[in-house]
Amino acid sequence: MKILVTGANGQVGWELARSLAVLGQVVPLARDEADLGRPETLARIVEDAKPDVVVNAAAYTAVDAAESDGAAAKVVNGEAVGVLAAATKRVGGLFVHYSTDYVFDGTKSSPYIETDPTCPVNAYGASKLLGELAVAETGGDWLTFRTTWVFAARGKNFLRTMLRLAKEREEMKIVADQFGAPTWARSIADGTAHALATAMRERAAGAFTSGVYHMTSAGQTSWHGFADAIVASWRAVPGAAPLAVSRIVPIPTSAYPVPARRPANSVLSNEALKERFGIELPDWRYAVGLCVRDLLSQ
């Protein structure tokens, strides 16, 4: 099986190169090889490679920048995704895509399920919803996995930012009234590999159905709780460099103004993923501990 992975240098893409290798030949494509900012170049790449699977891990992820650069976000997260999905259909392949909790408005009091109405509250979320719709409209075989609060030992993410600040500051003020499930990029990649193995068996048996599924860590917390766990995990590792921070202060969203509005509730239900694919991602606290150790080992 030949698997094309776009966004191969990103947090999830980097992990996919490892997790998908057990399923077949992985062809990782970095941005300079498959630039979603240039949708007109993408169909040729897929059609020339003729993969069995295309996994799109590339995205425009600058949430605040998207408020003033919405056109670029729509091209990368919307138009380009549709081009990739359509090209994958033409070569008879399966298209796998990632989306976000930000397609919801965050007003629900319980975890979101896949069929809840979408209502993005920022430009980034709107662009990701465009991508979801573009994939579905191709009529091909596809899977879209929505995830939340992605972190990794590499790249730009909340975990790495918190550790940098914790080394520099005695006090950090972190938002405590937004809730979600911090999800390790490695967990997403491993979950994708398991789901893909099942999906390919279903396709071979003529029993495959396309759909959207939520794929996040077990459990939930606030950004403040996430930051607290990151610092605690670092300090729990023998020999880890000392951190300057002594106080992590909870603050409301209103005390940390940013260009893009964030959903208050980003918790997604993973029950549909478990039911179809038998997948349960580890608890977010456990994943944070493993990721911190991974970072320290580099």
From Swiss-Prot:
Name the UniProt record assigns to this protein: dTDP-4-dehydrorhamnose reductase
What InterPro entries does the database record attribute to this sequence? dTDP_dehydrorham_reduct, NAD(P)-bd_dom_sf, RmlD-like-bd
Question: Lineage of the source organism?
Answer: Bacteria, Pseudomonadati, Pseudomonadota, Betaproteobacteria, Burkholderiales
Please list the reactions this protein catalyses.
dTDP-beta-L-rhamnose + NADP(+) = dTDP-4-dehydro-beta-L-rhamnose + NADPH + H(+)
Q: Which residues bind dTDP-beta-L-rhamnose?
A: 100-101, 149
A GO MF annotation of the entry reads:
metal ion binding
Instruction: State the organism of origin.
Output: Burkholderia thailandensis (strain ATCC 700388 / DSM 13276 / CCUG 48851 / CIP 106301 / E264)
> Quick one: which pathway?
Carbohydrate biosynthesis; dTDP-L-rhamnose biosynthesis; Bacterial outer membrane biogenesis; LPS O-antigen biosynthesis
- Site residues by UniProt (Could provide a fine-tuning to achieve optimal pKa matching between active site and substrate): 100
State which gene encodes it.
rmlD
Q: EC number(s) on record?
A: 1.1.1.133
